[in-house]
């Protein structure tokens, strides 16, 4: 795998355009913590990634509903312009009549929500030697006070004045030359103990062999408050000083060489929390998915001659529970111990409550649809307690397959919290060979689902998962770490699982694991979902449609062709007595870069880069 590189012309253009383009705008009111905390309840704005602290992506709006959604029409469309298109995976924010949206190549725009007019634009000056593994995407900004925040592909995070787009501060958190980058949206929380506001964000770069970090900063200055590595035995920081190691300082879940030192893979161990967190306010806990271990090759993280199942490669490919005050890892549930398939664990961890069908007790839970093909429900109270060793496999409540044809495991043991493996790990190369024997794996490393966030409906009490059916041929390869180069030790070829579809949108009951309904798509699904109190589910498709479904039964009620693949996340808000739905269009992401047969399938999808906003005609608004 080669990193994406810039041509000299692209670099010159970036230098010329990096200055902010600005149309003077009226100063809007500052965003408070109370505004952000109530984002899931208020309807006139969208102030957080996930539409609330719990990341449920559920809106209480009802003006657009199952009875009238088929009348939706475009209000306006905004082009991101220039030659830079690629994948548009962002989720927009809305505040005081202004939309804030990021786009490919580390750009951010402020747009008048009523007219679609650009108010200002900022484009980061990106060096030629950035190393994003999976396209030059950006998944969105955060907002607080008078500032808007977003990450850039050169491993930096930037704060801009939300009214002018002028840079307030910029902080670099890693060396982009060796693989550190940032694609996820930052997240604003309030430490419930100290009262301090925190800007929380992760790093990316597992595929280049870097240790993943989760950071918390002062949103006013950008100064680091704490930093937490997600590889066991690595040291964290608090207020600029060393704090405590992550887990056991001896890192017993990683093997040692004959010289007694930890294996080299431990130095490059991955675990990057590159997606966006949710926040358990009651427990003052940042909840986030941890990325895959590095390298992918399981044998580099296993003691020679031993069983990989004895070496978990903590704290990777799971869900992490971090104390907002100290940055210490309180709890962890690992979806894929000693992950050999790049199943990662980054996609959203959604916080929700339900009544236990047997006892009637209210359960405070977390839900996660993993790339490994299983849907997990965990006890977030147990995971946030912070007692003893952080790894808490017995926090598992349920684990059910949400896609077909899973080859690596038959299920999970609820007593131990561990997977019941089926012997699907690719063997190491034999003596004298450059690669190992090929195994057939489903889902492939692109996952049963991937980064695209699922949603939860408080009406139906179902989760809505943008999933895919596919597989891969998979084999180990010889590997030596080289800074700035891909650090995988695996070869692969993505293949079809079924002839009639790849994408499958599925509604799942988290109390039973039952698939209530599904909708199939020819192309891979790579967009997130959103539900509303109007009984609707919104998402996008790789062949260019924005679609609305009846959340109860999966009936397709409306669609609109945007002209390019939709691989972003929908939002909704109300303004001037009308409800609006917004989403980005612009095909890209990991599938066309890494997708094998899937990349060939989607060649016909045209490039693009735009923001679309929809509403009901005036005659139907009431």
Please annotate each region the language model reported.
Residues 46-50, 85-107, 132-156, 181-207, ...:
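Repeat-blade elements of multi-bladed beta-propeller folds
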Residues 55-174, 532:
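N-terminal cofactor/phosphate-binding cores enriched in small/glycine residues
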Residues 160-161, 165, 212-224, 306-326, ...:
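Beta-propeller blade signature
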Residues 571-622:
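Blade-level signature of beta-propeller repeat domains, shared across WD40, Kelch, NHL, RCC1
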Residues 78-93, 121-142, 170-188, 208, ...:
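Extracytoplasmic beta-rich repeat domains
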Residues 467-469, 497-555:
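Loop/turn-rich, solvent-exposed surfaces of beta-rich toroidal or solenoidal domains
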Residues 184-222, 340-416, 429-441, 446-450, ...:
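Repeat-solenoid scaffold signature
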Residues 29-74, 244, 423-430, 494-495, ...:
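Blade/loop signatures of beta-propeller domains
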């Amino acid at each position: 795998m080669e990193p994406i590189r810039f041509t000299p012309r692209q670099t010159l253009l970036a230098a010329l355009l990096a200055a902010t383009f600005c149309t003077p705008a009226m100063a809007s009111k500052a965003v408070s913590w109370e505004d952000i905390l109530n984002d899931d309840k208020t309807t006139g704005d969208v102030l957080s990634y996930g539409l609330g602290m719990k990341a449920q992506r559920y809106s209480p709006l009802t003006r657009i509903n199952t009875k009238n959604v088929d009348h939706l029409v475009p209000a306006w469309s905004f082009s991101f312009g220039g030659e830079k298109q690629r994948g548009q995976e962002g989720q927009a924010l809305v505040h005081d009549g202004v939309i804030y949206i990021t786009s490919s190549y580390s750009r951010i725009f402020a747009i008048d929500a009523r007219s679609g007019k650009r108010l200002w634009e900022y484009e980061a000056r990106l060096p030629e030697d950035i190393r994003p593994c999976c396209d030059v995407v950006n998944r969105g900004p955060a907002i607080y006070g008078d500032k808007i925040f977003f990450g850039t592909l050169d491993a930096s995070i930037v704060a801009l004045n939300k009214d002018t787009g002028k840079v307030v501060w910029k902080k670099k958190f890693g060396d982009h030359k060796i693989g550190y980058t940032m694609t996820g949206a930052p997240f604003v929380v309030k430490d419930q103990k100290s009262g301090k506001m925190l800007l929380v964000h992760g790093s990316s770069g597992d595929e280049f062999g870097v240790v993943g970090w989760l950071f918390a900063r002062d949103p006013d200055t950008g100064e680091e408050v704490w930093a937490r590595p997600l590889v066991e035995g690595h040291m964290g920081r608090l207020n600029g000083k060393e704090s405590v190691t992550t887990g056991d300082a001896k890192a017993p879940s990683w093997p040692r060489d004959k010289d007694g030192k930890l294996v080299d893979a431990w130095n490059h161990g991955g675990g990057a929390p590159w997606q966006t967190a949710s926040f358990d306010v009651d427990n003052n806990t940042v909840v986030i998915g941890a990325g895959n271990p590095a390298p992918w090759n399981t044998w580099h993280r296993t003691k020679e001659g031993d069983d990989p199942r004895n070496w978990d490669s903590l704290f990777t490919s799971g869900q992490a529970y971090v104390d907002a005050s100290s940055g210490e890892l309180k709890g962890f549930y690992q979806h894929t111990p000693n992950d050999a398939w790049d199943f990662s664990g980054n996609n959203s961890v959604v916080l929700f409550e339900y009544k236990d069908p047997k006892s009637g007790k209210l359960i405070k839970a977390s839900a996660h649809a993993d790339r490994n093909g299983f849907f997990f429900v965990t006890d977030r109270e147990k995971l946030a307690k912070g007692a003893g060793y952080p790894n808490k496999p017995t926090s598992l409540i349920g684990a059910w397959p949400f896609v077909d044809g899973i080859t690596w495991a038959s299920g999970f043991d609820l007593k131990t919290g561990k997977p019941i493996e089926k012997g699907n790990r690719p063997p190491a190369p034999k003596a004298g060979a450059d690669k190992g024997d090929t195994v057939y794996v489903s889902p492939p490393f692109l996952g049963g689902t991937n980064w695209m966030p699922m949603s939860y409906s408080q009406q139906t009490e179902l989760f809505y998962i943008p999933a895919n059916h596919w597989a891969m041929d998979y084999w180990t390869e010889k590997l030596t770490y080289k800074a700035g180069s891909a650090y995988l030790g695996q070869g692969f070829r993505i293949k079809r699982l079924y002839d009639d579809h790849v994408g499958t949108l599925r509604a799942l009951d988290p109390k039973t694991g039952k698939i209530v309904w599904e909708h199939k798509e020819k192309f891979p699904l790579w967009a997130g979902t959103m539900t509303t109190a109007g009984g609707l589910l919104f998402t996008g498709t790789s062949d260019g449609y924005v679609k609305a479904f009846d959340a109860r039964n999966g009936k397709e009620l409306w669609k609109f062709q945007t002209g390019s693949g939709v691989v972003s996340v929908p939002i909704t808000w109300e303004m001037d007595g009308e409800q609006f739905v917004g989403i980005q269009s612009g095909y890209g992401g990991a599938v066309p870069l890494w997708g094998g047969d899937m990349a060939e399938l989607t060649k016909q999808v045209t490039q693009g880069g735009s923001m679309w906003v929809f509403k009901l005609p005036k005659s139907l608004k009431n």
